[in-house]
Curated annotation (Swiss-Prot):
Source organism per UniProt: Arabidopsis thaliana
Entry keyword Cytoplasm: yes
Protein name: Acireductone dioxygenase 4
GO-annotated molecular function: acireductone dioxygenase (Ni2+-requiring) activity; acireductone dioxygenase [iron(II)-requiring] activity; iron ion binding; nickel cation binding
Chief place of localization: cytoplasm
Cofactor(s) listed in the protein's UniProt record: Fe(2+); Ni(2+)
Gene3D superfamilies: Jelly Rolls
Gene for this chain: ARD4
Localisation: Cytoplasm; Nucleus
Pfam families named among the record's database cross-references: ARD (PF03079)
Keyword Acetylation included in the entry's annotation: yes
């Protein structure tokens, strides 16, 4: 099964719900790629010996890896951490996540400042580009096991919105402007 993504509704209900619009408005992998979001479907049961994962890591320079179990039983201050992850932010570097078990949502902003919800399930590996506004939450299952990949030592520093003057945000917006061939208002 391929990655599922859709435009979100404007509801303030529980962040762990799907938040589909009515009718549903699905988002293609091609559209995500235009935003700089990359995707691979891998075998999470064989991640330790997966040659495709090894090739991705080698090609993209991901030389650091760790595993993260997110659930109320394994994370102290779980609700507070989930709230922090759900605060809209950017990073200076790519955010690379590979879902090994469970499920959750990455939300990203498109060029028109609309939220797109990406449902991560086992086998989904995504790369969010540096400078894209995004956030993360678990879904109603309240469990996900993620592999985090980094170039070099891990740095996970969120820069909460607004960050329009941040150099990495400007670079991201410039890239969108070039890709779409039109001026894109910074969000």
């Amino acid at each position: 099964m391929a990655l599922e993504a859709w435009f979100m509704d404007d509801s303030n209900e529980d962040q762990r719900l799907p938040h589909h619009r009515n009718p549903k408005e699905l988002v293609s992998l091609d559209y995500l790629a235009e935003l700089g979001v990359l995707y691979w479907k891998l075998n999470p049961e064989n991640y330790e010996n997966d040659s495709e994962l090894s090739k991705i890591r080698e090609d993209r320079g991901y030389d650091y890896m760790d595993l993260l179990d997110l659930c109320p039983e394994k994370v102290s201050n779980y609700e507070e951490k989930l709230k922090n992850f759900f605060t809209e932010h950017i990073h200076k570097d790519e955010e690379i996540r590979y879902c090994l078990a469970g499920s959750g949502y990455f939300d990203v902003r498109d060029k028109d400042d609309r939220w797109i919800r990406i449902w991560m399930q086992p086998g989904d590996l995504i790369v969010l580009p540096a400078g894209i506004y995004h956030r993360f939450t678990l879904d109603a299952s309240n469990y996900i096991k993620l592999m985090r990949l980094f170039v070099g030592e891990p740095v996970w520093t969120p820069y909460n919105r607004p960050q329009e003057e941040h150099p990495v945000r400007k670079k991201y917006i410039h890239g969108l402007t070039y890709k779409f061939g039109e001026t894109v208002k910074a969000h």
